């Protein structure tokens, strides 16, 4: 799948409101640019199946090719939601065979303790290069 149109929004959950059905909710994020609302439903990939709670920092990705209502605060359908760990950054990017991000902003160095998993949490046994990767990282050198 091509994720090039996915846009990340990082913020702290201000509120979680149950939706009209059993599998949806509205998550309000407090970001540097103000409040942004996200619809989260059964189609949303929530990494590690984390329970979303008020006060939690998350990165929510939306598809900028999908139509959105022209309202304020902005409202998007969350395609992916990830919760960064302490001092972690998250990046969704296409990486080449040398594990360099397509925008040249990050070069991955896979060590013995690096976990490479599929979206559903299974171990990924192939080389991770030449693919779209959702990367959690904490240390970079420039």
How should each PLM-predicted stretch be described?
Residues 31-35, 103-105:
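Glycine-centered tight beta-turn/hairpin loop motif at sheet-sheet or coil-to-beta transitions
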Residues 34-44, 110-119:
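Short, structured beta-strand/loop micro-motifs enriched in basic residues and often containing a Trp
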Residues 4, 29-31, 43:
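Residue-level signal for the start and early helices of compact helical domains
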Residues 1-26, 47-110, 119-142:
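Short, flexible, surface-exposed loop segments at domain boundaries
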């Amino acid at each position: 799948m091509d994720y090039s149109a996915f846009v990340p929004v990082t913020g702290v959950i201000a509120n979680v409101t149950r939706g009209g059905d059993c599998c949806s909710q509205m998550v309000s994020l407090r970001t540097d640019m103000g409040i942004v609302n996200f619809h989260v439903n059964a189609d949303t990939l929530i990494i590690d199946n984390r329970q979303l709670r008020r006060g939690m920092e998350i990165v929510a990705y939306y598809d900028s090719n999908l139509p959105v209502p022209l309202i304020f605060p902005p409202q998007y359908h969350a395609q992916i939601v990830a919760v960064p760990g302490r001092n972690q950054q998250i990046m969704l990017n296409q990486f080449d065979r040398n594990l360099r991000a397509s925008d040249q902003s990050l070069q991955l160095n896979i060590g013995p303790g690096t976990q490479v998993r599929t979206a559903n949490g299974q171990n990924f046994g192939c080389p991770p290069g030449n693919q779209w990767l959702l990367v959690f990282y904490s240390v970079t050198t420039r």
